[in-house]
């Protein structure tokens, strides 16, 4: 007991001393061993530290614990401290985070326990504070000698202090589930010559996913609290024996310890390891010198595993953001301000340096599993002043132990950073030439790294930028040596060689004068491109404003913090190099997962901030939309030159883009803009524009590309013209053509292309014409299934000679269409298309579907000839010599090959059997089936066709459906060359006539006949003007330009064309016997026209429709297609190139109203032939028609001759006899024809004429004679007389009633004969009217023009030429009770130019008898009014006559008009009355008349 007492007293004395230190205030006697002497030793076991007094910035220390702590004190002053198992638990202070992590802490169990124990802790804290105040007062009253002795003891102890700790761990509670652990295996502190040396080993940072594990070490908290309250605290020594603060605060610590989280070893992820750390510093020598200075840190190797940080990345970013927010105010402190530092430098005020240097041998950054970045020999040194210098000697980039980063050998470090003492700016240098090799494997890993940490980088950049806004950013100047980036591919490598780079952070990120692009093949390097003056700039405050455009080509502003500007980009390489690079790039990109498996995740519909910017420009305020972008790249000029294209047969190609902008908005939508794009061909010093500007405003872009992160890309093109020359097809090498034919199925990616005011220019193969397709607006959609094209309108223009094309104006012609712009260049508009839809299906067999709502073609004879020849010449015909088309030489036949050696050997004859050898056949009970038409010719033909074998695999299907087609034929001539040739021919004839030479008719362009003048009065030019424009001119000039209105209109409805193309391949030669019945089908074509009409619009013709469908009596029946054509192009011998045509044509019954002038116009129109457009082939080929079948065609023909060519009669043209007779409803039938072996279409015309003409003259003469106008009434009367007998007989045979049958026959007779009598009367009255009008014309009257008298109506200052209509006097009292005011009831019919169209007397017939009477009264009154007007004018002239001779002349002129005009009125009134009477009993005749004759209403609409 006596030995125990001193030891117990020692413990309590030491315990009293330790309890005065707050950290060890929880030490208990059970955990303390004391041994005092010359080598005093103190041992502590399992000590829970009182950490509530530890104050760390932004961190709460929850608990602390030491498993073992040994303290050795020697009399000589040595102090040795060793320990093991030191553990601290920390967490961020409350509200440290401003995100969801702080809410987790707010709702945690720890917060609840702390709030619950707050009241218990307040009383204890108060008591302890009172004792500490008393103790401080006692200490303060101690003498100063004690202070001196204490300081001396501490100085001796600190001077010989040694520390060694093992297994040190800091647990940082990031959240209730994640714990970050920082462990150190060993720490050793030694003091040598007043220098402290700290060695640390086995440093490791890890994190774990944990669960709550509350401790239960203190259970009797209530009793401890009660004991604490009843304890006498007067004597502190006694209280130290019987009382421990750990017991009083057990409830508080139990709540804190409940936050210690437990985790298994499998859940721990190591993110950082440090091999060895050596720290040397000075300071901490006495109680008055506790500062640390001259610190040098040496680290052997650091390994950072970036991939393993991903689970706690969110927590680390939150800590970083919170730390920046809480320390951002430090930048405004006086000692951190730049002005204060400058003041220190000027006043030579030096601060004591704490950190001197940090030296790291190696830092290994493990970016991914196999991707590693090593930094070797890193040095950070504090220089005299305010900045730090740094250097990195070398760098290595490794992937799977393969090195990708190389630098030139040098003794200098790779990176170095030096401070600028004068400007307090930093300068960083890259002291070596470096090379970075990138292959697809490494790029895949880098893209994975960017994808994984891109969002984190953007977040860090965002929060650091927000922090930097509150203080002035430091300036860092960077300068490098040459940098080479090498992209390794399969067969080649691409190298980017950069000149020294400069940058001034944070404003200028990248600045290089030149970047060279080299192609490496083996040991050979070729320069293929250069980039000049690339500058990348950034702004920490504010944004760059870049003028750009949206997809509607409207001006916008792009606001961005990062902007790159490239002065020029120029690539120059050959086609072979381009193909090599393209193939390698395609393979390279195909091996990258980001390209083969693009990220299709939708990032949500983020709303990009859009605002309006008010700009003041030219005293006008306008709004401009603005958008935010992550970056903007501006390229002033980009150019690419491809040399030696198509084996140097095509020349060089130059692609040029000016003022390009590339940007990416916050939705990751990539937008590219090109203001001006051009593609040129250079061959033999001649430049040809392939893609060029067509009437486009240069202030707006021509190309806009939008590529969203999710969704289809969209390309917008405006004002671009594409030029294609058909001759370029010959420049393609034969090997390439074979590759094109064998090309596999095309695949398209989803994309939308919109065209605005674009055009396609086509130049044919042999002739010099030019065709332009103008596209005002179009939408093209690409998809894996095919292509869809839709547009509202399209226009085709043509020029006859590209050599006379006017030079394009550089100035933009505003407010005009693209078609008008081309017309100013010399083109003529010919075709206009409305609402077109085209679909290209990407299947095994190519399918094209085209739907068009309306096609309007307006042509003259010369422009139609040029258009057809141009369309044929766009794809040159493939012609072959006869040796390839036909088998000229017979094949050698081995006649002995088919001889049978046993031919003469006697064999058993089956016919030699006897009667017994035959069996009796069974008797069949079935009936005999007779096959009809067994011997029919048609059936034999079908069988013959079926006997042949053919293989037709469809490779191409084209379907075209046009709802409405209009072909307008204009008189006159479009091309200047045509007009010039005609004028020259006329001038030559006129000169020869004036010289008295013998003249004959001249023919120009195979269709224009110029007759020789008969006398000096006749003027050829006036005759031509009268024929073309139907007008009289005395100017002496020829008017050969196209007429204002068309002469003939060909109108079709529902035109359907279906084309099926097969394999166009020459088969291998086979034996003659095996291939005698084989043939190859190249293509099938099916054409169907539902309705077809030809409208006659010649001024000299009174008829309306030249051709139309015959009306059927069955109105309920569905009308078939008017024209159906089925054609097949075959190759009869598969191994030869000769082709033949098989055609079948079906035509419905037709009605023709043929006027001789119209027939002559159509004949000459389609006969026009210009030698400039003649297509000459090397081997001319005439289409051979193997078989042609035309079904029987029924015609209802009306023919009106105008003149007779007597010269043709004399020469033997018997067809001229037709011009002596007028035909009215002649019924003609063209019989069914099947032709074989027709050599071309010219021969076909002759053969058909030789077949149909004799058949008509032999079998259909009676029908034609009955249609002659003089015999038409007699034929009608004879039909009525025949019906008087035939009709009763037929009815009597049917019902046996004689009375009713006789009555029916009488009705038919009366109707037929009555109608014919009325028609005859109408013809007589109309003929009489015509004779009277012609007589009046000869005597000086108005004649036919008197039907519509020209007058002048004055309205204000305008004079309108008009015509008096037949409804002039509708305000008369007989039909209208309103007051008579003729001037207000004039129906104005405008003239067609300077001439009037002639209307037939049979046009505009009244529908019934009452209408006939009304029209008769109006015509009579009109003619009487004209007579009265003529008499009134004659009376005025008589008054003004100067003599009797003049008066007699006036009366002689007026007398014929006064006498004949009333007779004309009478005949016209009688004709109208009879027409109304006839039409009342024949309602279908009105529709026939409207189709046959022109009307005044139709003339107004044309």
Swiss-Prot record:
| Acidic residues: compositionally biased ranges | 223-234
One biological process term from GO is: piecemeal microautophagy of the nucleus
Pfam families referenced in this protein's UniProt entry, alphabetically: ATG2_CAD
Q: Which InterPro entries match?
A: ATG2
Lipid bilayer topology: Peripheral membrane protein
Q: List the disulfide bonds.
A: none
Write down the chemical reaction(s) this protein catalyses. Answer: a 1,2-diacyl-sn-glycero-3-phosphocholine(in) = a 1,2-diacyl-sn-glycero-3-phosphocholine(out); a 1,2-diacyl-sn-glycero-3-phospho-L-serine(in) = a 1,2-diacyl-sn-glycero-3-phospho-L-serine(out); a 1,2-diacyl-sn-glycero-3-phosphoethanolamine(in) = a 1,2-diacyl-sn-glycero-3-phosphoethanolamine(out)
- What does this protein do, in the record's words? Lipid transfer protein required for autophagosome completion and peroxisome degradation. Tethers the edge of the isolation membrane (IM) to the endoplasmic reticulum (ER) and mediates direct lipid transfer from ER to IM for IM expansion. ATG2 binds to the ER exit site (ERES), which is the membrane source for autophagosome formation, using basic residues in its N-terminal region (NR) and to the expanding edge of the IM through its C-terminal region. The latter binding is assisted by an ATG18-PtdIns3P interaction.
Similarity comment: family membership = Belongs to the ATG2 family.
- This one is known as Autophagy-related protein 2
Per the UniProt record, the lineage of the source organism begins with: Eukaryota, Fungi, Dikarya, Ascomycota, Saccharomycotina
